[in-house]
């Protein structure tokens, strides 16, 4: 859908209507929902660094390194369930090494 054009001040036409300047509103507190604060982000990263990954997460990263994406998703679904999108994003941050140059099936 195309963005709405500003009103022209005319009585007829697609952009009819009185010309007004849009009012700048303060951000609502509900706009922050779902965003983590700097402190929370720092604490979570610190805990991750100290504690490491849970055993099922280690298994998933190993499967991803080998290239078994579908199997890794099934393991995650089995252990965590579908509702944990944040875990999926977090796991995406883990770097998987690319296969060696000698592998001919990639």
UniProtKB/Swiss-Prot annotation:
Originating species: Daucus carota
UniProt keyword annotations, A-Z: Ribonucleoprotein, Ribosomal protein
GO cellular component, one term: ribosome
InterPro entries named in the record: Ribosomal_eL36, Ribosomal_eL36_sf
Similarity comment text for this entry: Belongs to the eukaryotic ribosomal protein eL36 family.
Designated gene of the protein: RPL36
Ranges of Basic and acidic residues composition bias in the record: 75-93
Keyword Nucleotide-binding: no
UniProt cross-references to PROSITE patterns, sorted A to Z: RIBOSOMAL_L36E (PS01190)
Region (Disordered), start-end ranges: 75-106
Top-rank lineage group of the source organism: Eukaryota
GO MF entries: structural constituent of ribosome
PANTHER family linked to this entry: 60S RIBOSOMAL PROTEIN L36
Record's keyword annotation contains Isomerase: no
Gene Ontology BP terms: translation
Pfam families named in the record: Ribosomal_L36e
Name of the protein in its database record: Large ribosomal subunit protein eL36
């Amino acid at each position: 859908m195309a963005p709405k054009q500003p009103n022209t001040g005319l009585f007829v036409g697609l952009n009819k209507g009185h010309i007004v300047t849009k009012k700048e509103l303060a951000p609502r507190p509900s706009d922050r929902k779902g965003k983590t604060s700097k402190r929370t982000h720092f604490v979570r990263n610190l805990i991750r660094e100290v504690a490491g990954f849970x055993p099922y997460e280690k298994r998933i990263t190993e499967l991803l390194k080998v290239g078994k994406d579908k199997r890794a998703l099934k393991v995650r679904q089995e252990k965590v369930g579908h509702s944990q999108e944040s875990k999926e994003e977090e796991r995406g941050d883990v770097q998987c090494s690319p296969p060696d140059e000698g592998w001919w099936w990639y």
